Regions:
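Catalytic metal-binding/acid-base residues of hydrolase active sites
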Residues: 59, 81, 125-127, 166-167, ...
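Long, structured stretches of catalytic cores involved in phosphate-ester chemistry, encompassing
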Residues: 131, 290-387
Length: 420
């Protein structure tokens, strides 16, 4: 039986006013998020429900700080690389501190926390975990030196460190080197002290779970897509091995990188360390770990360029399958990025960019080599911050000055509407 409800004029007016008020409240909330932080002003503090992703520019390697909607903190890599004179970007802010110290200080300023819930070390290279020499200071227990990841840990204690394979790397360890011995010594010291070190659990959607108010943000999701040559299939917790356990020759460390995807409502973010697609012109298809990871990641709003946009990464499948609106190149070397990679990420097939691409530190000689496209970068220097609105329906990009610790805003972009 259908019940007919008759509404008088007063009831209708009340309803209209309530709807108008709700619409105004929604518009005001969105307008509040859209209020652009002014050029030359400091970055406003993150508000509850927003998600921030900071690509930190030290000129010495990758480091990305993620502050989830509930305040859970994650750092992806803490690089402190070295290179021949003239081939590296200038140290940012300067060389008075080690890169890991700068990264930790940045995270302490912008995370609202004194500790990191998670550190993901994507793979075993200095520009992602830290280099050492005889002058690098020893940790308090004397078992390892402070650099990169261990420098961050000393200033901003890491709750859970996620490594691509710890403690059993099988036959996949890179050639012995001081930095590698130091990093493994650091992990052993952590484990001996009862501090958590985990192997990346490929396919897991729980290894990077929210720590503070998870139930308030049910649309936040994380997924470990790949590690040590194993890639998620896209089904449940199933995985597939891409790099053979006993390849015909020793695989380069980059193909073993951790890949991950974070999502919040309709927003999504991809990071894949130094995953690459170079197969020696088709001779060794298994060396392409980038393409299967991009395929399972699917369309993504913002993506960090694999391997700094270098010549062997960011191939056609990477850009086609991620289909990102924004790409961020964590560049610091004269070779970052390659011309084809820049054109591909920009979608500049008619010489005009159709996607927004940002670089944390474009080397002047690289800008010259890439002059056909470098002028179309949205930024060539500075910390690149993705600020996602509560709920994930939109986001903005803010570029911060990396020449000192004031980190004043030098550019604002967006808002971008998340496509889901």
């Amino acid at each position: 039986m259908t019940k007919t409800v008759q509404l008088d004029r007063r009831t209708l007016l009340k309803g209209a006013l309530c709807l108008a008020g709700a619409a105004l409240s929604t518009q005001q909330g969105f307008a509040s998020f859209l209020e652009a932080d002014g050029i030359g002003s400091p970055l406003a503090a993150r508000r509850e429900g927003e998600m921030d992703i900071h690509h930190i520019d030290t000129g010495r390697g990758n480091s990305t700080l993620v502050v989830a909607p509930d305040g859970t903190t994650l750092m992806i890599d803490a690089g402190a690389g070295t290179g021949p004179a003239g081939t590296m970007s200038a140290a940012r802010p300067d060389e008075s501190r080690r890169p890991g110290e700068w990264q930790a200080r940045y995270a302490l300023r912008h995370s609202g926390s004194t500790a990191l819930d998670y550190m993901v070390v994507t793979h075993l290279h200095t520009d992602h975990l830290g280099d050492v020499n005889d002058r690098t200071p020893l940790a308090h227990d004397g078992t390892y030196r402070l650099t990169g990841v261990s420098d961050v840990d000393a200033l901003m204690p890491i709750g859970t460190l996620i490594d691509r394979a710890w403690p059993d790397y099988g036959n996949t360890l890179p050639p012995s080197a001081p930095y590698l011995t130091n990093y493994l010594g650091y992990l052993k010291s952590r484990a001996a002290a009862g501090r958590t070190v985990q192997k990346a659990d490929v396919g897991s959607d729980q290894q990077l779970a929210l720590k503070k108010h998870a139930t308030q943000y049910p649309t936040f999701k994380s997924r470990i897509l790949a590690a040590s040559g194993v890639v998620w299939t896209g089904q449940g917790h199933e995985t597939q091995r891409i790099v053979p356990e006993n390849p015909p020759f020793k695989a380069y460390e980059n193909v073993y990188s951790i890949g991950l995807r974070l999502s919040y409502g309709r927003f999504s973010y991809y990071a894949g360390g130094d995953l690459s697609a170079d197969t020696s012109d088709g001779r060794y298809p298994w060396m392409d770990t980038e393409s299967p990871v991009a395929r399972v990641a699917g369309r993504t709003e913002v993506a960090a360029a694999n391997h700094h946009g270098y010549f062997d990464a960011c191939g056609p499948e990477f850009v086609r399958d991620l289909d990102a609106q924004v790409y961020i190149i964590q560049s610091w070397d004269i070779g970052h990025p390659g011309p084809a990679q820049m054109q591909r990420m920009m979608g500049a097939w008619q010489n005009k960019a159709t996607r927004d691409v940002f670089a944390t530190g474009l080397h002047p000689q690289n800008a010259l080599m890439n002059r056909r496209f470098s002028g179309q970068l949205k930024s060539q220097q500075g910390h690149v911050v993705v600020r996602v609105a509560p709920g994930g329906d939109s986001y903005r990009i803010l570029v911060l000055d990396s020449s000192d610790e004031r980190n004043l805003i030098t550019g604002t972009f967006g808002p971008y509407r998340s496509r889901g």
